[in-house]
Regions:
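Short, surface-exposed beta-strand/strand-loop-strand elements in extracellular ectodomains
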Residues: 45-66
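Beta-sandwich interaction modules
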Residues: 34, 71-85
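Hydrophobic beta-strand residues in large extracellular and virion-surface proteins
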Residues: 44, 52-54, 70, 88-90, ...
């Protein structure tokens, strides 16, 4: 679930966001975001009816159910408290779409 922290608790500021959608092919790992040293925030939302596994790293670094599992209607965010700047990949056992955004 996305947990918005108060502005007073974070100095994480960003000026622009890119809103994207990634189509995942069944059982095929895919890169979702490139590594980005300017990243300040990212969110991933599973609007599908099947599980999606997020992989913090290259596609070969994870597998179905070996990463951050997003249940249907689930979400995960990268923020000032867990700022990860590397690649983000994903995989699902079924064809689906992953909605995501990245802010710099």
């Amino acid at each position: 679930m996305i947990n918005n922290i108060s502005v007073a608790e974070s100095n994480n500021r960003f000026g622009s966001c890119t809103n994207l959608e990634k189509t995942l092919v069944a059982n095929a790992k895919a890169e979702v975001l490139n590594a980005n040293t300017d990243r300040r925030y990212a969110a991933f939302i599973n609007n599908s009816t099947v599980d999606i596994t997020l992989i913090l790293g290259s596609p070969e670094d994870g597998a179905i159910n070996k990463g951050i599992i997003l249940k249907p209607r689930g979400s995960y965010e990268i923020n000032a408290n867990n700022l990860y700047l590397g690649k983000v990949s994903a995989v699902s056992a079924f064809a689906c779409k992953l909605t995501h955004l990245e802010c710099i």
